[in-house]
């Protein structure tokens, strides 16, 4: 299946939940953009985009089973749900295994073992921060402790910390001027 076909399948799977659909499209768009800017090879890009589209596939099930969509529940339940979802897509076993791994780790910021994993974390963070209006301090913390790609860092700065670099340069200039 093409990425567009997987996206369509996931939209159908989402059963009209506009919040979930909007979020997966945001994450996919950011992941696609960062992956392309970082120059991922086509196979890794496809795996990344598929993982971005399906990363929250367990949310409907978690809402029913647990009454919430906490990250740990998404990671636990997401593996088997995305495995079933990927059947019949024509994705080879190794690629499907990687997508399953990414979906079942997309809230774990330690042990990042590839550009696809790193970019998925960054894309999901940007989308969540936008949707939930997280404070700038959270973005600065993520930027310094989790963000790893140059493209992801640029997008975080531009989207979540607009004007921050200019303000930092201005403050630095004022400090230099007053310190002379």
What are these regions (language model features)?
Residues 12-41, 54, 91, 107-180:
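Divalent metal-dependent phosphate-bond-processing catalytic cores, especially two-metal-ion Mg2+/Mn2+ enzymes
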Residues 19, 44, 70, 74:
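Conserved acidic
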Residues 2-26, 58-69:
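Active-site flanking loop/helix segments enriched in acidic
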Residues 42-44, 95:
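Membrane-helix interface segments
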Residues 93-100, 112:
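Active-site-proximal substrate-binding core of FAD-dependent oxidoreductases
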Residues 27-30, 72-88:
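An active-site-proximal "capping" alpha-helix that borders the catalytic cofactor pocket
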Residues 45-67, 78, 82, 100-107, ...:
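His-Asp-centered metal-binding catalytic motifs of divalent-metal-dependent phosphohydrolases/nucleases
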């Amino acid at each position: 299946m093409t990425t567009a076909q997987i996206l369509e399948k996931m939209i159908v799977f989402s059963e009209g939940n506009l919040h979930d659909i909007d979020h997966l499209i945001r994450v996919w768009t950011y992941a696609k953009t960062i992956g392309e800017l970082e120059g991922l090879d086509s196979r890794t890009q496809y795996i990344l985009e598929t993982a971005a589209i399906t990363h929250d596939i367990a949310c409907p099930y978690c809402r029913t089973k647990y009454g919430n969509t906490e990250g740990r529940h998404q990671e636990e339940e997401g593996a088997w749900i995305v495995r079933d979802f990927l059947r019949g897509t024509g994705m080879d076993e190794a690629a499907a295994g990687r997508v399953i791994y990414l979906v079942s780790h997309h809230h774990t910021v330690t042990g990042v073992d590839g550009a696809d994993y790193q970019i998925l974390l960054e894309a999901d963070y940007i989308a969540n921060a936008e949707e939930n209006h997280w404070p700038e301090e959270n973005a600065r913390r993520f930027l310094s402790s989790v963000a790893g790609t140059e493209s992801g860092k640029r997008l975080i700065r531009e989207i979540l910390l607009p004007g921050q670099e200019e303000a930092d340069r201005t403050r630095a200039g004022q400090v230099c001027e007053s310190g002379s």
